[in-house]
Amino acid sequence: NTVETDGQTYEVDKITYSTDEDGENKYDEMIESVDIMGNTTKYDRDANGNVIKTTNADGTYTLANYNSKNSVVVEVDELGYATIKAYDSNGTRLLKEATSLHPLSQTDINTVTADNFDPVTYLAANEASYAITSHEYYADSYVSGIAGLIRATTDPEGNVTEYDYYKDGVGKGLVKSKTLKDGNTVVNTVSYEYNAQLQVSKETTSFDISKNLYSVKEYEYDKFNNVTVTRDYGTGSTPATTVAEYDLLSRKTAEYA
């Protein structure tokens, strides 16, 4: 599209793609886009086609770095704040995700965006500068035929969430329960049951662990995965029932209690 302004003609709402030596664009890789207002965004890519720099119309930019599996290991925003992701030796399981507490210096930016950057080594040396979430995994044999199940996640405050999974049946490989701990103290538990469509049909949440009290909710769905009926039992046996209706675009149109 073209727009004329002050006697000048500009192309807007336009995308430019990269091409190989034969002049072909095989992988739908953009190098530049111009929006309807004429703002231009540019994209730099590595040898594998991953976007490593995005330059905005105002000259600010974001940076990214990738591992050998083409998974993002570094993202640096326009202000210099970084998110670092450390994977296992295979480059597939996320072990740590860290967000910088302060903008990085240019030296650190150069370090984290360099080829062959090692997030594990870097985070070990710079833990104090990041808020870090870490993950532990079950052995691949824990649930037959399903690998990569997270056993526990520790947030930046040190709170630990432990996960258990269904080993067979309808919900095989889906989360059976979550347990939140503060140190060795159980703070909260949530357990799940699933229907034949693998949607959560029942959710049981601890209300008062010391008194063994739990609140229960049950759910029904339509064929578009919208929740149509919610039964909230609280800690009792009589539910408060809520019914929801949706239009053909899955927008909620009515709710009755």
Give residue ranges: language-model regions.
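Beta-strand elements of repeat-based all-beta scaffolds
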Residues: 1-56, 60-257
